[in-house]
Amino acid sequence: MKSNAFDSSMMISRRGFLSVAGLGIMGIALTGCGAKGTAAGTKGSTAGSAVSSSSTSVRVASLKGPTTIGLVHFMDQAASKDSGLANSYSFTLSTAADEVLPSLIKGDTDIALIPANAASVVYNKTKGGVTCLNVNTLGVLSVVTADTSITSLKDLAGKTVYLTGKGTTPEYVMNYLLDAAGIAGSVTLEFKSEATEVVSVLTSDPTAIGVLPQPFATAALAKNQALAAPIDLTDAWNEAAEQSGDDSQLVTGVTVVRNEFLDEHPEAVEEFLKGQSASVEYVNEHPEKAAKLVVEQGILESEAVAQKAIPACHLVCLTGKKLKQALAGYLEVLYRADASSVGGTLPADDFYYQA
């Protein structure tokens, strides 16, 4: 299991931002982006017997990670000849956000499920050319350790914590939470390039403490019974937000649409949103059945890991005011840490759909 697929579903790096920002200069000559993705759910999802000739073809791009897990039931529905949908849907799954963003910017993708900060980057790059439809995934990070004395963030004081994502959102999130807990100066963050390296440290040292994304956290716990995940950073963020009096949440993934497509095909966008919302509800209520679909779509290899990881992925469909409340404050935290992580400036109000 490669870590980049799931790390990339949480963040876009500074390097990734610069590569996207340079598309205009480079003439957007990135013909290989589509080749790196994997077409998914295409059988019966193009115009067929169940779709009228006046239907709209909707091109959806997403990532092989938590941001797509909540969509798998809708993907399965769209692939059926008896889907009952008015429009046709094609899905492309990629392993990194940097593969999806050029396609979205060029207009080759209509709707995309991408990291929250990447959505802000694209908004700025396109001068407000995309709209955020919803938050689809909250936090997917957990503190993992065999040290039973660790039960809260304050217990990390004086400790070393191993994690991935130096110079990207995991580092900014961790710094924010440690500062909120009043222990920022007493915790050492040691970064690894791969989540598997963090798992290796946890396996070899029973006193080690790590921060892992899903599904790596679930997989690590399944392989090593001594490990536990005592702190869910999504819950820790909620506590910090409550203390500071804001409504922000720890956000991993969002769904965006090109404004040109939204203006031309509002009914298709609404149908997608309805299907996505129902899909998230299905996945959360039926993790065992959903796990099978997760494997079928090539997101994970193990149904057992998928089933256990689903509850920890915090799959949601936050729209309207809840969307803006959750996302705006999160982007503000990232902006304060590194403005380039959100594209240089924070999105204006028109970024938030029906907020």
Regions found by a protein language model. Name each.
Residues G34-K36:
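Bacterial signal peptide processing site
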Residues D76, I105-K106, N124, D179-I183, ...:
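Sec-exported extracytoplasmic/periplasmic mature domains
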